[in-house]
Regions:
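A short, structured N-terminal alpha-helical element that caps or precedes a catalytic domain
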Residues: 1-94, 98-100
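Active-site catalytic microenvironments for nucleophilic, acid-base chemistry
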Residues: 91, 117-120
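N-terminal [4Fe-4S]-dependent radical SAM core
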Residues: 96-99, 119-120, 124-158
Length: 158
């Protein structure tokens, strides 16, 4: 799998997600100015920056099938990363025919996200929706919520 990426600053997150979904399939990341190896399976990820926003675009080709998506984003690196990873996850899971139990979350503790969202004043329904937006299954989202409730009691008792 060849992945063409015009934003080196999101390479780690993109590569981690692709490796989780593709398993043992070799992944080659190609940055601007590098030669592109021949491979029928490819992903092209581009971020076009404008004044106050960006347009994120993902084209995934796998086993002769092609999926494409575009979405606006702010210029914030974290939001760009989340937008790209969400589109990438949706395109690859559609092409592969399987999802991951924790969705597109890589290297992130879901309970930590739940804690942060709770502390930001979000309601449980909003938090669950946000987690499912990340591709987290409803069962895993509920597990994260339950775990946070248990941890919260312990932390507050300290």
């Amino acid at each position: 799998m060849v992945v063409k990426l015009n934003r080196p600053d999101i390479r780690y997150e993109v590569e981690s997600l692709i490796r989780m979904l593709l398993g043992e399939t070799p992944v080659t990341i190609v940055l601007p100015g590098e030669a592109i190896p021949d491979d029928n399976d490819s992903i092209a990820i581009t971020v076009q920056e404008q004044e106050k926003c960006c347009l994120c675009h993902v084209v995934a080709c796998l086993n002769g099938e092609k999926r494409e998506a575009s979405s606006p984003s702010t210029v914030d690196r974290t939001e760009i990363e989340q937008t790209i990873c969400r589109m990438l996850y949706n395109q690859l899971t559609a092409l592969l025919g399987h999802t991951l139990p924790w969705g597109m979350l890589t290297g992130v503790r879901p309970v930590k996200l739940v804690r942060q969202m709770t502390e930001a004043g979000m309601a449980e329904a909003e938090i669950t929706q946000k987690l499912t937006d990340y591709g987290v299954s409803e069962e895993r989202a509920q597990l994260s919520m339950d775990t946070w409730h248990n941890q919260r009691e312990i932390v507050e008792a300290l």
